[in-house]
């Protein structure tokens, strides 16, 4: 989809060929985390046309109106409409807690009460929320030869989240994740990259 392959993803691969390769590899179905919502979701579904049994789409949400009074109502509407269009989960990307900011320049937190509408609506619809909060803990410590990932950080400096003026600490992010999960016992959460 668009998030990982860019605007021209529709021409990047042949869906029929891709599905054939998946089936040859023993894949019964695939979960697409890049479903978006609205017109972008329709575009994705057109790309998957004829192979709907092969893909489960997870929706993404629009956080540009996070500080607006109608954020909760708009978000609930998007979730319900995307569900009616066939989405079977919600994907919260790590950019939410790492790069997105509120109107005061503070990081957006997944345990903010304004997000309750996301988790409560997911529970009501019996769909999971896949919440990608952070990257490896080493990316949140200064780059040095003592950092187990220093070579990766040398090659990809944009993965360095050690600046506490800009990013929450890894521990803060994990506590935020724990707060979110604990306060929504009826919601199914998928926490990726555990290990």
Question: What kind of feature is each model-predicted range?
Answer:
Residues 1, 31-34, 58-60, 91, ...:
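Active-site neighborhood of phospho(di)ester-bond hydrolases with catalytic His/Asp-centered motifs
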Residues 1-50:
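An N-terminally biased module of ancient metal coordination in phosphate/nucleic-acid-related enzymes
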Residues 1-5, 130-134, 191:
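Histidine-centered catalytic micro-motifs
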Residues 5-9, 158-171:
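A short acidic, glycine-rich active-site loop
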Residues 6-8, 12-13, 171-179, 183-195:
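H/E-rich (His + Asp/Glu) clusters that bind or coordinate divalent metals
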Residues 17-21, 78, 114, 118, ...:
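Alpha-helical packing segments of well-folded alpha/beta enzyme cores
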Residues 24-28, 51, 85-86, 118-127, ...:
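A structural motif corresponding to the C-terminal end of an alpha-helix
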Residues 39-166:
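Active-site gating/metal-coordination segments in enzymes
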């Amino acid at each position: 989809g668009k998030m990982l392959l860019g605007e021209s993803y529709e021409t990047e691969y042949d869906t029929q060929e891709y599905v054939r390769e998946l089936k040859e590899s023993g894949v019964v179905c695939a979960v697409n985390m890049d479903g978006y919502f609205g017109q972008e979701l329709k575009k994705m579904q057109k790309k998957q046309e004829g192979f709907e049994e092969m893909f489960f789409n997870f929706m993404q949400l629009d956080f540009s109106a996070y500080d607006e009074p109608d954020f909760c109502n708009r978000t609930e509407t998007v979730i319900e409409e995307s569900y009616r269009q066939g989405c079977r989960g919600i994907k919260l990307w790590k950019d939410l807690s790492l790069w997105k900011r509120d109107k005061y320049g503070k990081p957006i937190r997944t345990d903010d009460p304004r997000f309750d509408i996301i988790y409560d609506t997911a529970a009501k619809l019996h769909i999971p929320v896949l919440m990608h909060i952070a990257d490896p803990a080493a990316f949140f410590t200064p780059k040095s030869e003592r950092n187990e990932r220093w070579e990766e950080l040398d090659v990809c400096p944009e993965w360095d989240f050690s600046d506490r003026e800009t990013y929450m600490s890894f521990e803060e992010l994990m506590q935020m994740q724990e707060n979110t999960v604990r306060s929504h016992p009826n919601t199914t959460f998928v926490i990726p990259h555990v290990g």
